[in-house]
Amino acid sequence: MTNILINNAFGSDNPEKASVAFIVGGASAARDGETALFLTSEAINLARKNGTNGLQADGYKPMDELVQTYMDNGGILWVCKACADAKGMTADDLIDGAEIAGAGHTLSFVDDGAQVLM
């Protein structure tokens, strides 16, 4: 099965787009192959402890449930290092299972054959 990389730049600024990224990610993570969600810009706050509290797009499940389902299905959660540095975020700020990853780390995943969804 093909590995999948999903790039998500949306968080509380557009909860609907953020929700869709985690819904697609959760479905992909439940399949064979690896799925990584690369969070950039506002989306990095979704990996922050308590960063999804109270966040829910109209008609969608709460963001904390979508993130938890993604993680429970074996999804990989990467936070853009440049974005984290710009916002003063460290590994201690992240939910369990999330990690800060630089561009090289993410591009290696693509070089190894991952398909990219934006």
Language-model region placement:
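A glycine-rich helix N-cap at a beta->alpha junction
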Residues: 53-81
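Short, glycine-rich nucleotide/cofactor-binding loops
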Residues: 5-19, 50-51
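N-terminal beta-loop-helix "entrance" segment that forms/cooperates
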Residues: 43-57
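Histidine-anchored nucleotide/phosphate-binding helix
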Residues: 18-32, 37
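Short beta-alpha junction loops
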Residues: 41-44, 84
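Short internal beta-strands
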Residues: 35-40, 77-81
